[in-house]
Amino acid sequence: MLSLKTLLCTLLTVSSVLATPVPARDPSSIQFVHEENKKRYYDYDHGSLGEPIRGVNIGGWLLLEPYITPSLFEAFRTNDDNDEGIPVDEYHFCQYLGKDLAKSRLQSHWSTFYQEQDFANIASQGFNLVRIPIGYWAFQTLDDDPYVSGLQESYLDQAIGWARNNSLKVWVDLHGAAGSQNGFDNSGLRDSYKFLEDSNLAVTTNVLNYILKKYSAEEYLDTVIGIELINEPLGPVLDMDKMKNDYLAPAYEYLRNNIKSDQVIIIHDAFQPYNYWDDFMTENDGYWGVTIDHHHYQVFASDQLERSIDEHIKVACEWGTGVLNESHWTVCGEFAAALTDCTKWLNSVGFGARYDGSWVNGDQTSSYIGSCANNDDIAYWSDERKENTRRYVEAQLDAFEMRGGWIIWCYKTESSLEWDAQRLMFNGLFPQPLTDRKYPNQCGTISN
């Protein structure tokens, strides 16, 4: 747990002097070596792992998402006609239960949903990295927060140990900011966009600095090869200049100047277009070890859902070519096999699905595209749907391996098929081994 006093001290000590730029790469080396501390850090474009990042997200574990673990939220159901009374996110989950009961249910979830055998399976299936989301409240809360706090960190540390034991690398992902950075349920608090309010920004900065300091220490650098400063900030509704100047840049300076670490930082693209970040934290200005994280889905708008499979694949391939000339390293930190939004609560509790026309959000509605019946039962999938899903997955893998690689969302769920890498592999919809291709060169390239 962190204190607000620590925050003030930390913020006051952040230096404004940039770290020594990393030397030019030795043509014979796949890694940079920083002059000051001689430590190596991972070059996501040039093979420091010996292959592209091929990872999985550990979603729905240390930060709840209703569609990943619906049983935790179904426990609140009072009728079969609608979702009234069901909490929409972890904030309301804890608020409805009270901290003691919420703590009991969450500890049961944390101790069972992922165990070391899962990480052994991940490694045996050929993946090389796990991205682990966690919310700010795991480390510090606002005065009126209902969240359970102070316990998740030990599970995160345990997971890093599991990863190390199985030769997996880790991204630690700050997935939820105080006040919420995007209003999504996956931030912990739906329908709020108050991340950059001064009090919320101060708490989130304090938490981030704690994460940076701890997981950039020598004991973690063999396994933790990136820290994501904040997941999916909703750029179109945020003050981007304030986020850059008051959150992202100070985090970099704290990491390089105070901690003296060569840890890689991950910046989500904030839903901005390709090349938007090219002039931010540039090598010419002395910055290094910066990776841009792009997330790609084609299911959260009706026009996307209406695309033919060939159109889906064309868009996926453009995701790869679109980042070829971005100046920073780039990785696709989230994508999915999904071609529908049928999974219950994918669009959040109470909203329905656009695909079958049941989606309602205020006065916004959707029109029927196709049926969602038996969506999570592979026995009801046609051969064409199976082939299309496999084609789409392979196209995305090829596209994302044009640069630094990919991290699928997510490794497992309680019941979803389209969003569960385990089920996808079991049913032949996701390649095993990961380099296997039934539909090679869909993007006009050969995968690594």
UniProtKB/Swiss-Prot annotation:
It is an enzyme of class 3 (hydrolase). GO terms for molecular function: glucan exo-1,3-beta-glucosidase activity. Coiled coil: none annotated. GO terms for biological process: fungal-type cell wall organization; glucan catabolic process; glucan metabolic process. Glycans are attached at residues 165, 325. InterPro entries: Glyco_hydro_5 (IPR001547), Glyco_hydro_5_CS (IPR018087), Glycoside_hydrolase_SF (IPR017853), Glycosyl_hydrolase_5 (IPR050386). Present with 4280 molecules/cell in log phase SD medium. PANTHER family: GLUCAN 1,3-BETA-GLUCOSIDASE I_II-RELATED, GLUCAN ENDO-1,6-BETA-GLUCOSIDASE B. Belongs to the glycosyl hydrolase 5 (cellulase A) family. This is Glucan 1,3-beta-glucosidase I/II. It comes from Saccharomyces cerevisiae (strain ATCC 204508 / S288c). The lineage of its organism: Eukaryota, Fungi, Dikarya, Ascomycota, Saccharomycotina.
